[in-house]
Amino acid sequence: MVDKLIVAVEGTAVLGPYWKIIVSDYLDKIIRCFFGVDSTSQKSSAADVEVSMVMFNTHGPYSACLVQRSGWTKDMDTFLQWLSAIPFSGGGFNDAAVAEGLAEALVMFSVPNGNQTQQKMEGKKHCILISGSNPYPLPTPVYRPQMQKLEQNENIEAQTDSRLADAETVAKTFPQCSISLSVICPKKLPKLRAIYDAGKHNPRAADPPIDTAKNPNFLVLISENFIEARAAFSRSGLTNLASNHSPVKMDVSSVLPVSGTQSISNSAANVSVISRPPISAGNIPPATVKIEPNTVTPMTGPGFSHIPSVRPALQPVPSLQASSPLSVSQEMVSHTENVQEMKPIVSGMTQSLRPVAAAAANVKILNGVAQAHQVLGGGTSIGLQSMGGTPMLSSMISSGMASSVPASQAVLSSGQSGVTTMTGAVPLAGSAQNTQNSAPSSFTSTAPSMSGQTVPAMSQGNIPGTQMMPSGTGMNQNMLTGLGATGLPSGTGTMMPTPGMSQQGQPGMQPVGVNSTSANMPLSQQQTSGALPSAQSKYVKVWEGNLSGQRQGQPVFITRLEGYRSASASESLAANWPPTMQIVRLISQDHMNNKQYVGKADFLVFRAMNQHGFLSQLQEKKLCAVIQLPSQTLLLSVSDKACRLIGMLFPGDMVVFKPQIPSQQQQQQQQQQLQAQHPQLQQQQQQQQQHLTQLQQQPLQQLQQQQQQQPLMQLQQQQQIPLQQSQVPQMQQQQIHQMQQQQQIPQMQQQQQIPQMQQQQQQQPMVGTGMNQTYMQGPARSQLMSQSQGSSQGLPITPGGGFMN
């Protein structure tokens, strides 16, 4: 007697943020109790169960597939891996196709001949509906098994029931098929409760109490017939629960005598399970894969293409059946079972099998990452310094290492690792000598081959790199740790080629071309084969989680991400990263490219498991996402390659920009502006001198008029004239002194404006908690500036609550 369980999950992005909580707090407990695993992790030998999964989406063009299902498995660990690897994407605009998902579960539970006696011989059947959206309100064409009635005249009514139905109508069929229906929802939606009530065996029975104190907003409804699930949430456990319920004992005892005949009849009737030929890969032992029949229309891509488990090839894999392709039809499996994808080495894993059809672009993604890292030379901890006033970042973020680094077509043998790169050919030139391009006959001298075979480095296409000319700027020693080079002077030297830097906007740089036959890597004339011992350069997976944004203040799942760091970077780089990265704000990429940062930044490569419209909007609008980590700040931008993102990781909760030294052109422009203002000052001085002469002439004219009009008062006027003449120079001196002060005021203002302009250039905004504030550089950087110009220097920021339009 085999008990069966089907988990029907909504695959849209609405359920993504809550999925880990649902699996850890509810599904994990139910499945372990269903498999008979007690608290000591000892599996009961009497447990004979099978589990499967159905994933449904929404109607409309926003979902690639309406309904997908997996095969049956008897391995608990494999099924838990399936659940943890569900790709939640799309949807969110329409109601979920709950009716189609429940109907698919009924098809998987149904008996081919519909015999009631045989149905009684089968074990218990349970279904758990997990959805975060309301069901589609209109009846849709779904398939439901036709239950044979005792009277023949009722067959017509049974045939008419399987045409159009909504979710509640499909749920009413579950009690007729002796299937228990349970519901888990992260929101208390009344329509999902109505579906649960429609699927109850006894509508008047009270719902068993479930402790939801940890998640008060969750709707958890467990069927009264799902004894294992109720025992998983009860503190007393399965033993006390079985002793307190006598109907359970009677049910088990009545079924036990027919267990022998049931196994025979079940094996004879279960013709839907088709054994597949063994699949062998490397050192993995073969295992039988069971595939469900083709009951729905074949589709272009396989369902759950990334669900198979990844384990080291040196360890035995007891159940590859768990990693069987969760497909929609046999036809799809026959086309996709031989497709392999090579992934970067992840903590000792050498090779992973992944049935891929529509996701073939992922092969190019990681190969492109290997090529990008081939030019990086294994060092991602780069001290970003100024090279003669030219920013080193240039178009690193805007191009995203995509336009300059094409996908590789390197041939990898089955015994080699997934990524083979070289670091010995990275140029390191002296300060007094320019490097030259040379074409070595082979890479055996600078990059030894792996496993006795030559390493195919690059194939077709040009990989433009950059060669920094020496300008007396110190070289960061962290860049050389991956190459094993020590004792190099830090005061001089050239920087390593950085992928993604444009050739037009970088003066003093030389492109490094790579053709299809030989790689022209710049090598120093003083470099020998034994001077720089090469090390295998690879990217290591350090993090996997979700990327979410905000829409109207609520978190919205965007995509599933995988983060990769360089082998030379710190192992504890992502030690305290949360499982979900929350985007707090958006900034412009153009502003980032024109700035330089204080301290060092770690470059990381992220791979998006599925494409989302928000990522394409970031690329079109040239925006960069800011993510606040517990002790770091991550700037994330989308590259030109599909599903690839570039991350810049900075320590601390803010990013500090380097002060910009004004170039010679800017100084010349300032001098020209000052010279243009000098003629204006000269004109003002001339006008002031004319005004002084007028003031001097006015008192003399008044005295002459008075002498002509009053001849009788000449004696008195003669006595007063010396006094007035003595007063005129005093008035002239006062007026001249005032005019000189007025002339000095613009000059002082100009002298004060020049230091203010220099201070404004040195004061740069920061990304992080102080996005709308300006901080002083140096020791007093944490003090707020009181100038009114500080608020106008902030980065152009899209409001955090509305960037997910």
Curated annotation (Swiss-Prot):
Spans annotated as Disordered: 430-455, 786-805
Record's GO cellular component terms: mediator complex; transcription regulator complex
One GO BP annotation of this record: positive regulation of transcription by RNA polymerase II
Biased composition (Low complexity): 438-451, 786-795
InterPro entries (alphabetical): Mediator_Med25_VWA
Self-association state and partner proteins as the record states: Interacts with MYC2 (via N-terminus). MED25 competes with JAZ7 for binding to MYC2.
Record-stated family: Belongs to the Mediator complex subunit 25 family.
Entry function: Component of the Mediator complex, a coactivator involved in the regulated transcription of nearly all RNA polymerase II-dependent genes. Mediator functions as a bridge to convey information from gene-specific regulatory proteins to the basal RNA polymerase II transcription machinery. Mediator is recruited to promoters by direct interactions with regulatory proteins and serves as a scaffold for the assembly of a functional pre-initiation complex with RNA polymerase II and the general transcription factors.
Protein name (record): Mediator of RNA polymerase II transcription subunit 25
Organism, scientific name: Solanum lycopersicum
Gene field: MED25
